[in-house]
Amino acid sequence: MLTKFLSLLLLLLLLGCAFCNSDGSQSLHMLQISYFPDPYHGRHQGNASLGKLLTHTLEGPSNNVTILQLQDWQDPDSWARTESGLKIYLSQFNSLVQLIYRERKNDVVFPLTVSCSVGCELPPEEGSEPHVFFDVAVNGSAFVSFQPKTAIWVTGSQEPSEAINFTLKQLNTYNRTRYELQEFLQDTCVQYLENHITTQNTKGSQTGRSYTSLVLGILMGCFIIAGVAVGIFLCTGGRRC
């Protein structure tokens, strides 16, 4: 079940997260939120920015999401494919919630809100280590978080539950959710930021293309983990599977 579940979420995505600057450093900070008042209705919200430049927005119910590209970094045909792929993903995401509800109706708790925060930051001074992070929250409470130095997922709650322990066991089993994520955050994301500082004023079009690739890669992992949190929480009702 989990293998099929993860495979379903390995779709090419572009939106759903927020990138922003922190004081004194160059950073990428991403946030994606999905809200389900009941099994049959979902609403998604997200945006993407590079530095202080807002590049994409996403908002709306699962069956009528509005997705906008604010910067012309993808040609119309390419953007149409990206937009279509994301809408298909969101539709399948909503269908997955309904499926789990049908299977475990007595254990599902609504409303349900899942948020996924992931990013990397360059320090204001040379010689300091970059800061990278990946945190998942369910219904406003810390659920799990990623420790990049050890490539281990840990509980984000003061009181670990069987649901959280089960989730951690699954996340710490797969190379994709451990070492591939570690490499992407510590290497790919950080290197992109370093290169962006150098090239942002001289190679605008190239920056746009590399930024698109970066977002695609990060968000694949972003939605995988957010999806795992949704699936486990719905399956357990916050208690046990």
UniProtKB/Swiss-Prot annotation:
Residues 21-213 are extracellular. Keywords: Blood coagulation, Glycoprotein, Hemostasis, Membrane, Receptor, Signal, Transmembrane, Transmembrane helix. The chain crosses the membrane at residues 214-234. Gene3D superfamilies: MHC class I-like antigen recognition-like. One of its GO terms (biological process) is negative regulation of coagulation. It is found in: Membrane. Residues 1-20 form the signal peptide. It is a single-pass type I membrane protein. This is Endothelial protein C receptor. It comes from Rattus norvegicus.
